[in-house]
Amino acid sequence: MSNVRYISNLTRETYALILAGGRGSRLHELTDWRAKPALYFGGKFRIIDFPLSNCINSGIRRVGVVTQYKSHSLIRHVMRGWGHFKKELGESVEILPASQRYSENWYQGTADAVFQNIDIIRHELPKYVMVLSGDHVYRMDYAGLLAAHAESGADMTVSCLEVPVAEAAGAFGVMEVDDDMRILGFEEKPQLPKHCPGNPEKCLASMGNYVFNTEFLFEQLKKDAQNAESDRDFGKDIIPSIIEKHKVFAYPFKSAFPNEQAYWRDVGTLDSFWLANMELLSPTPALNLYDAKWPIWTYQEQLPPAKFVFDDDDRRGMAVDSIISGGCIISGATVRRSVLFNEVRVCSYSVVEDSVVLPDVVVLRHCKIKNAIIDRGCIIPEGTVIGYNHDHDRAKGFRVSEKGITLVTRDMLGLPVGYE
């Protein structure tokens, strides 16, 4: 059997479950009205588009999206952008909100979110179940992970990557492996992570992406559901309980293409979210959104092209080293090193630099904005200065991050708020 046919069979026998119910509390007010997977990224996408696109580009066409926290905008986006699958061809992207199938509780943890959907998974009759994190921005060929799982004879395989020890502390599940990548130890979010052999600066962290043999997964979930002491979490409970008696392997994260650097970003803080967007402005970014070999799919709104108007000496509509999305109007203003999402309007004599501006923002005249994240629908009053003096920003009610990025939301401006 050819390798292509072998991989095709594996992906057809797989059901992917994307866990997209998290809030992302370290993003503060940016996720007050949306789940983290619904957060905007890269000028026109949402975070959920990346694991969904990875599934499609990897050949996995049966996907469930598990939702819970403030899920309205996430559900709306998935329905609009991912409803083109053909059920008659065995394709589907289904939304799986918490529905109290097995108890009166909502999803209590990552393992419980899967457990409460066992009946739906069983109906699909998959040989393998892939459980994926829905709140990271990354590009990954899941077919390689599936092939490694099948060839090793593992009961479970955990996708992993090397991260700095300081970065992993309290943030990631950390594992120990032998020379064959079999997992010998696993600790969820330790404060003192164990480093990789021979490299005290790095540790092996879980990406929150798992592959299970289906019946093995069901057995472990049912056993966990009967344990009153469990937190119902894969990292805290399931993995530590099975590594001694079962075959659990780690799979090193790698690029979807040879000779390319693998791309993965945890955009779980204001600083990391801002930086990951800024990285896209490089002439050769680590994440190439223009790569036709691995397209990122999303809901495509019907919008007019961006427009730049006025070319006078004292006001010139221009943008440099920036991403400007459809429907934007730069009217006698200057935009430098910034990411503007759709339908942003920047009015005359204003300057926006080194900033991420989400959809439907209006920046009125004579504003100066730098090192900022402006949330959707904000109307920045005329003459407002943001990002130049952190004390002044805080006095206005804006949030300033650890590394000096200023967040502005509608609520901070006294504007009505709601689901986005």
Swiss-Prot record:
It catalyses: alpha-D-glucose 1-phosphate + ATP + H(+) = ADP-alpha-D-glucose + diphosphate. It comes from the Bacteria. The keyword Acyltransferase does not apply. Alpha-D-glucose 1-phosphate binds at residues 107, 173, 188-189, 206. Homotetramer. HAMAP family: GlgC. This is Glucose-1-phosphate adenylyltransferase.
